From Swiss-Prot:
InterPro entries: H3K4_H4K5_MeTrfase, SET_dom, SET_dom_sf, SMYD2_SET, TPR-like_helical_dom_sf, Znf_MYND
Subunit field text: Interacts with RNA polymerase II and HELZ. Interacts with SIN3A and HDAC1. Interacts (via MYND-type zinc finger) with EPB41L3. Interacts (via SET domain) with p53/TP53. Interacts with RB1 and HSP90AA1.
Localisation per UniProt entry: Cytoplasm, Cytosol; Nucleus
Keywords annotated in UniProt: Chromatin regulator, Cytoplasm, Metal-binding, Methyltransferase, Nucleus, S-adenosyl-L-methionine, Transcription, Transcription regulation, Transferase, Zinc, Zinc-finger
Organism, as annotated: Bos taurus (Bovine)
Name under which the protein is recorded: N-lysine methyltransferase SMYD2
Annotated positions binding Zn(2+) 1: C52, C55, C74, C78
Keyword Nucleus among UniProt keywords: yes
Amino acid sequence: MRAEGDGGLERFCSPGKGRGLRALQPFQVGDLLFSCPAYAYVLTVSERGNHCEFCFARKEGLSKCGRCKQAFYCNVECQREDWPMHKLECSPMVVFGENWNPSETVRLTARILAKQKIHPERTPSEKLLAVKEFESHLDKLDNEKRDLIQSDIAALHHFYSKHLEFPDNDSLVVLFAQVNCNGFTIEDEELSHLGSAIFPDVALMNHSCCPNVIVTYKGTLAEVRAVQEIHPGEEVFTSYIDLLYPTEDRNDRLRDSYFFTCECQECTTKDKDKAKVEIRKLNDPPKAETIRDMVRYARNVIEEFRRAKHYKSPSELLEICELSQEKMSCVFEDSNVYMLHMMYQAMGVCLYMQDWEGALRYGQKIIQPYSKHYPLYSLNVASMWLKLGRLYMGLENKAAGERALKKAIAIMEVAHGKDHPYISEIKQEIESH
């Protein structure tokens, strides 16, 4: 039997990659290939009160759950529909109080177990790939990853034992490994984290650093649209990672999270690497060793900053960004991706501190190189135009604001589809100013 999903696509065996998704008909840029409802999903804790727990709608005046006072809903219908999942957490949140702190992965996995019990047969999210078929890469897990899974299993038992029956430890190890490899993060139009989910049919797609589709979200529905022309017989590729970085960094990330090395055209030719690690034009050009050392420093500082976010103050974080940029600028151009990474982090800190002018200054330096380094239709570029547009509008520069927001819309009409609520909201922002 040929496994066909929404017309025009089939599951097939991709040489050297295992399972994959292939087009049976042509798709133009902006065409919707398919959509997939979430099999299981969870709203991130920090977005409670901003979004409905059930449908992820973003609106004012949501009603809170009368029992736990932690979950918010559009109306009684959303609350009732969400109860089979919310009941896993409602009374435990009251009982544990401040000590209720399972990770998002644990929360999502609890919901998968509940879903499997409520709905053991195949769901509309699994037209081409069932959750139980997910790759776990169990044989490739190192001790550190196994230890992390064991601590997740302990937390699952600790917080969810009242409302869930658990399979044995080995089955839970497999399930957590599957979630780690196949889970998705749902993000909003500015790429802020909204939650985590499982979209089985979307997980069927293999990775490429020059993807021909992009995945976006409409509430808890994933939508897959073409960002390149796709011909019948061609494989459908998405990107699993941020494509800003040079080949070696991308593959380090892919090996660490997904256990493979990419061999797409971008990785084989390394065409963009030179521009991505642009070296400052000096009368006395830096030696190869100096460049190597600075790349090593850049990677270390990126990791140091990622950790520091959890415990340092905004002003300390800004200092790390500024000092590292100063040091790197002796060797790197401003358009170098390691410089851009720290500028982006600095912009984020400025936004957090409500330093709108500071955020705008960083955004203005980032946007042109971003447009060069990323693919043509990139959510990273769209979200940067969006942030810039909103900053300009807030600082009363309407003309620049409108220009930037229109650039964001041009990308989003392809990536999200012309009828996406985000696009109507942005058009509204332009009109109301």
